[in-house]
């Protein structure tokens, strides 16, 4: 076995500096953040039932109105995913650009039609502009790492 002689203190510092992109990542600046203004703006590439449960646990720990923009790949279990997300003020489905294996935002909206306050927007930017955010509200974009990548590129 190799002995790298790494001190515990260095391991702790390394762990504290891990940056997990698109996993409850806060967007603090940029073009899309400017649309969200002073509200908390997150992206999280959760795309399955387990990820949705963890996301929901986090969202339920927050005392604010929560707005979700969601786009997903066609091969995911959309119904199981959205069943895990509770107490959401609005859900806006979107298309994921340049992803032929994504479900269209319109189809996703149809799958979520049993939920209140579900709408469709053609793009992330249009979705953000369509949501009435009050002071202190949260906006999270989720459902696919591809969608989160698009957000980072647009921002």
What do these predicted ranges mean?
Residues 147-149:
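Short, active-site-adjacent cap segments at secondary-structure transitions
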Residues 1-90:
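Nucleotide phosphate-binding/pyrophosphate-handling subdomain across enzymes
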Residues 38-41, 82-138:
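C-terminal helical cap/extension that packs against the catalytic core
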């Amino acid at each position: 076995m190799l002995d790298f002689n790494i001190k515990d203190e260095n391991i702790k510092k390394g762990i504290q500096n891990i940056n997990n992109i698109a996993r409850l990542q806060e967007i603090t600046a940029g073009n899309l953040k400017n649309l969200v203004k002073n509200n908390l703006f997150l992206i999280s590439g959760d795309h399955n039932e387990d990820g949705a449960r963890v996301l929901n646990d986090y969202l339920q720990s927050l005392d604010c109105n929560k707005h979700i923009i969601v786009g997903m790949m066609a091969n995911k279990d959309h119904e199981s995913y959205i069943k895990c997300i509770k107490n959401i003020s609005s859900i806006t489905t979107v298309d994921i650009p340049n992803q032929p294996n994504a479900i269209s935002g319109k189809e996703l909206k149809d799958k979520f039609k049993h939920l209140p306050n579900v709408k469709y927007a053609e793009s992330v930017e249009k979705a953000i502009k369509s949501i009435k955010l009050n002071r202190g509200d949260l906006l999270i974009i989720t459902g696919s790492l591809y969608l989160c990548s698009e957000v980072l590129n647009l921002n």
